[in-house]
Amino acid sequence: MATVLRHQGPEIPQNITSKVSFFRSQLILFNSRRKHGLLYSLATAGGLFCVPGVLGVIASETEIDLLIERTVPLPFITLMITVGMFVLNDLVDVELDRTSSKKRPIPSGLVSKRQAWTFIILTNGAAVGMLLIRLDLVSIMLVLPMILIGIIYSMTKIALMKRFLLKNIAIAIFYMLCGILGMTSSYGTGLVINNPIVLLHMIAISGIMIFVGSIVNDLGDTEGDREAGRRTIPVVLGGENTIKMLIILLVIMPAISWMLYSTSAEHAYHAISMTAPIGVTIVASLALVRMTSIQKVFEDRDSMRKQHKKWFPLYMVLQSCHVIAALLPL
């Protein structure tokens, strides 16, 4: 009987295979929360340019390497912290996400819990590393609370994500800190100190918007949150009352913007351009139109998750309004 000889290629060492698997797992985890990371990172990037006069200060910088060092790392710090903390939340919520049929890497088994922990440590470690290289006291004072909020949001014993109002307030504060991190860069700190009303306008409007959006997300998870014993706003107030509250907040948002604009005009320093309240009014109006659709489907989990995804462009438009208002004073 003839013997058939088959050519066998070189065996791939097991450690190389494991490395490929590891890097792939990290990429999967990053991509799973990339959209949220970019949203919060853009809040920081927008903050760099939403202070009137900051472009002139940046343009006066003669050392390009110093300009890059003082601005570029900030959005990346926010990006790393955000994706890391969202994955931490996914890790804690793995059983709930599995029962809710959410297609995320950890509950679906695409990545292991160990790989998720590695991702969390690496992303936050990278953020802290960039922060230490900059050695800017103001940035440190803003980033450390961001990390702390991310931890206690998911930490089992405290778990802000389970607590009535505190969950959404924590998300709003985190988002506001992202914007402040950009506004108080080395080039914007002095301008913010001289015109604090600009800072107040940004954190008030952005805070309300992200607060409303986070509750819209909770509306899609009402059943799962109720079964898990979480006291989210929709669980406590009910869907209809929650939507009424969101509509009131969206109406208040442009009112606050116009009030702050009028205040700055009365004091004759026009810290806020009229472009800002006009833009905020447009965004709030679009959000109210979106709320009419939400009223019809808030009891349907899958439809609500789609509605929350449609909320993301509104965040982007609002960030653009802050920047445009600084660049085009009226």
Task: Please annotate each region the language model reported.
Residues 1-330:
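Multi-pass alpha-helical membrane architecture of UbiA-family
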